Amino acid sequence: MHAPVEFHSTLDTSVEGLKTLIQNQLKFSLARDPRTASARDWWLATSKAVQCVVIERLMATQTKHRDGNVKRLYYLSLEFLMGRLYINSFHSAGVYGNMEQAIRELGLNLDDLRAEEYDMGLGNGGLGRLAACFLDSLATLDLPAIGYGIHYQYGLFKQEFRNGYQVELPDDWMKYGTPWEIVRPEHTVEIELYGQVENVFDNLGNYVPRWTDTKKLMGIPYDIPIPGYGTNTVNFLRLWSSKAHEDFNFEAFNRGGYDEAVRDKNASETISKVLYPNDKTESGKELRLIQQYFFVACSLQDIIRRFLRSNKDW
C-alpha cells in the first residue's frame, strides 16, 4: 500500500461554504437564476460543486505520483459499469452530511436531485461492474492506477416493452452532458488502420518495413475522476472517443457530394457509438475488432507518453 496523499484544501466545505460553492456553480457554470432553475440545474450545480472537491484531490494525487515517478497499474476494459456517481461522490469526498444540509437549506430535496442522474452508458453487466469495483478499490488502497476504456455515446441500449414485446432503443446517456468527465484534447492520439506493409531495406541491409495506405483515426480522451473512500487519493478513468482525422471533405461538399463530405467522419465516429454492436454480420464483427484495437492502441500510446515524460529511456 502506498502512503496516502496529503494536502490542505483551499475550499471551504462547511455547510455555508458548500452553499456558496453550489450557488456559484449555478450562476457562473450554468448561467441559471436560482428563482427559475430546474431540478436538473440544481443537480448539475451540486454535482459540479462536489466535483471541485474531488478535482482538488485529483490534482494533488497526480502531482504526488508524477513527482515520485511511481509505477502505475493500468486496467484496460471494454466496459465499466460505473453506476450513479452523485451520492457516491458526496461520501468519497467526505462531505455527505454538510452537502445534505446545504441542499436542504437551499430549499431543495436531495432525493429529487439524485433522481436527475442518468446511469453512464459505459457498461452492461458483471465484467463492467467488476472493472468499476477494481478502480474504486485501487483508489481506496492508495494505489496509483489508471483505467482505460471507450467513451460510448449510446452505451448498450434502452429497453421498452410495446404490445408485450421488447423494443431496443438508443440509450443517449450523454444527451444533457455529464458533470463528471473532463475532456483532455491536449492528449489526443492518432492511430492507423488497414493499409499494407511494404518490405523495405535500408542502405545497410536492415529490414525497415513501411506501413502505407492507412486510414487514420483520432482518439480524444475524456477523464472521469475515481475518488477513494476515506482517503485523499483520486485516480481516474480515461475513455477514448473516436474522431475522423479529417472531419469534413470540403472539396466533395463543393461539388455537391454532401454525403461524401462527411462519410469519413460518420464511419470513424461509429467506433465509439455503441457498446457491443451486433456481430452477426461481417461488418459487425469488423467493428468489434476495430473497437478493441482502437482503445488498446490509444491507451498504449498514452501509457508510453506518460512513461517517457519522466524517463529518458526504458
Model-identified regions with their sequence ranges:
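A conserved ligand/cofactor-binding region detector
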Residues: 1-314
